[in-house]
Every structure is written in structure tokens, then in C-alpha cells.
């Protein structure tokens, strides 16, 4: 496929970006051809995690070492990621969907619209109930927003209801969901959004 759909996955370190990609790819790869690009600062650890998970053959996963400023590689100078896309398509010219995982960064990180067609931003409840109120650009501008690790809410004193209300304030009608990716809670909502809002748009 000459022009696959590209979805960026952003969020802070430990929020669940790699796990989200693993879970989504495991489901969608049964129906379509997928590739993944991971961005890490000085290692290719996320690439190794995905390879070891077995959700895709190693040739369909490319790790990019971004150096000290990971958000630059997905926005101001995305040349390494564009090169990785080209390499994926040389390896597998049938790829229909590519996930690009950003290096863990702050709440302001966003993807260049030239690099991705859609973006998902993920945070986790353990970062605190107040995180949605901070309204970082990654959360505000992403096409889909995920609040992960709902099981930790009682342990950190976070109200999921309050987080939902705060999210609606800064996102308006843009979609979001809660997840517990350890148990796949909320995963269907993410899959449904991808199939409905990205894959159909790409085919229209």
C-alpha cells in the first residue's frame, strides 16, 4: 500500500504506550497489514518489548534512537521517523497501518501533522487526578485520549469521575476513554475508534 494510515501514540514515560500498541496490534493484525515504529532516547527498549511480545514479526518493527529531545523527532525534525516509514514499506509494501510511538515526554508533546494522520495520547491515573486539569497540548490536540491504569485510582486517591469531567472541559466533544490495559478494560473503545474514525477515513 503506497500510503498507509499513520497513527501516533504519545504520552509520558510509563503511561502504557507500548502496552497499548501491543494490545491493539494483536487484535488488528488479524485483519490487516501493520508496522510499528518506536522512538526511544538512547536505546531501542520499546522495540525489543514489542518484538519479544510476538505480536508482529521483527521485520515489521523499527526502533528509532532520538537522542536527548524525543519530541523533536516527532515534530520539528521528524526525518528519522520518515526514514523508518520508508524502510518499513521497503520491507513490506503491503502495510496498511503504521503506529508511531513517541519517546516518553511531557504533556506538551504533539506529533507533526506531516508525520501522522491521527494521534492518541495516553496518561495514567497514578500520575494524579489533577493531570487532565493541566490541559497539555498532547491531551488537548490528540484525536483520541486514553486514561490508563484505572485500577490504581483507589490507591492514589484519584476520582475517575472528576478526571472525566476535567477531560470533557478541555477536550470538548473529542473522544476519550478509560482503560486498564492489564485486563483489556476499555480496549474495545480504542479499537472501535481506530476502525471507525481512522480506517474508514483512510478509505474514503
Swiss-Prot record:
It comes from the Bacteria. It is found in: Cytoplasm. CDD domains: UreG. GTP binds at residues 11-18. Transmembrane segments: none annotated. GO terms for molecular function: GTP binding; GTPase activity; nickel cation binding. InterPro entries: CobW/HypB/UreG_nucleotide-bd (IPR003495), P-loop_NTPase (IPR027417), UreG (IPR004400). Pfam families: cobW (PF02492). The keyword Ribosomal protein does not apply. The keyword Nucleotidyltransferase does not apply. GO terms for cellular component: cytoplasm. Facilitates the functional incorporation of the urease nickel metallocenter. This process requires GTP hydrolysis, probably effectuated by UreG. Homodimer. UreD, UreF and UreG form a complex that acts as a GTP-hydrolysis-dependent molecular chaperone, activating the urease apoprotein by helping to assemble the nickel containing metallocenter of UreC. The UreE protein probably delivers the nickel. Belongs to the SIMIBI class G3E GTPase family. UreG subfamily. This is Urease accessory protein UreG. The gene is ureG.
Amino acid at each position: 500500500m503506497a500510503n498507509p494510515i499513520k497513527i501516533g501514540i504519545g504520552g509520558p514515560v510509563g503511561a502504557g504506550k507500548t502496552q497499548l500498541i501491543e494490545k491493539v496490534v494483536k487484535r488488528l493484525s488479524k485483519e490487516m497489514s501493520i508496522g510499528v515504529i518506536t522512538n526511544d532516547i538512547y536505546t531501542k527498549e520499546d522495540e525489543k518489548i514489542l518484538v519479544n511480545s510476538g505480536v508482529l514479526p521483527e521485520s515489521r518493527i523499527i526502533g528509532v534512537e532520538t537522542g536527548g529531545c524525543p519530541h523533536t523527532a516527532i515534530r520539528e525534525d521528524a526525518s528519522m521517523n520518515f526514514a523508518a516509514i520508508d524502510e518499513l514499506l521497503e520491507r513490506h509494501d503491503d502495510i496498511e497501518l503504521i503506529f508511531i510511538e513517541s519517546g516518553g515526554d511531557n504533556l506538551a508533546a504533539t506529533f507533526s501533522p506531516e508525520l501522522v494522520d491521527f494521534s492518541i495520547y495516553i496518561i495514567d491515573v497514578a500520575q494524579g487526578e489533577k493531570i487532565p486539569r493541566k490541559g497539555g497540548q498532547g491531551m488537548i490536540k490528540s484525536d483520541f485520549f486514553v486514561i490508563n491504569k484505572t485500577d490504581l485510582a483507589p490507591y492514589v486517591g484519584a476520582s475517575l469521575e472528576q478526571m472525566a469531567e476535567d477531560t470533557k472541559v478541555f477536550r470538548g466533544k473529542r473522544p476519550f476513554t478509560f482503560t486498564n490495559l492489564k485486563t483489556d478494560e476499555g480496549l474495545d473503545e480504542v479499537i472501535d475508534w481506530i476502525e471507525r474514525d481512522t480506517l474508514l477515513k483512510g478509505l474514503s
